């Protein structure tokens, strides 16, 4: 018999710097169901993408991390994108942070460096995955739910 341990976790605060269309965003998240509404291109999907990025350290929108760096910031010689989540897991308060740093490399080039911190301590993605959990379903994934077994 396998015992399943349920984790009580909720996101309390999300902070974004130079992420997608946001130069700065600070959101206090209430401990209840949250509904994101607004016109197109206002950042609703970007907020969801940021939350997912902090759980998986990859985007569900792109396979190129450089594309999530704010367009205007990416023009600078040194560009930094920062995502921070303050959350509570069971009864423990935690902070997870991801930094994407575009820095000069070679002649006219830039390289992207990713830093991940858990409670202020640098860690590898493998060490941190599973500390902050998120699941995303987008319309493109409908075949996973609705499709025939062979499609899944």
Regions found by a protein language model. Name each.
Residues 2-53, 74:
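Pre-Walker A-like glycine/lysine-rich segment at the N-terminus of P-loop NTPase domains
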Residues 48, 151-152:
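Short coil-to-helix segment of the ABC ATPase nucleotide-binding domain corresponding to the Q-loop/switch region
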Residues 56-145, 149-150:
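Nucleotide-state sensing region of NTPase/ATPase domains
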């Amino acid at each position: 018999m396998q015992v399943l341990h349920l984790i009580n976790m909720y996101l309390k605060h999300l902070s974004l710097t130079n992420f997608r269309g946001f130069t700065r965003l600070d959101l206090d998240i209430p401990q209840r169901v949250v509904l994101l509404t607004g016109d197109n291109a206002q950042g609703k999907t970007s907020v969801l993408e940021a939350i997912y990025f902090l759980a998986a350290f990859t985007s569900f929108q792109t396979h190129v991390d450089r594309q999530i760096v704010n367009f205007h910031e990416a023009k600078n010689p040194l560009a930094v994108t920062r995502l921070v989540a303050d959350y509570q897991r069971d009864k423990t308060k935690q902070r997870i942070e991801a930094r994407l740093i575009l820095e000069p490399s070679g002649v006219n080039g830039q390289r992207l460096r990713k830093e991940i911190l858990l409670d202020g301590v640098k860690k590898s993605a493998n060490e941190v995955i599973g500390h902050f959990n998120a699941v995303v379903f987008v319309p493109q994934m409908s075949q996973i739910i609705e499709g025939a077994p062979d499609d899944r």
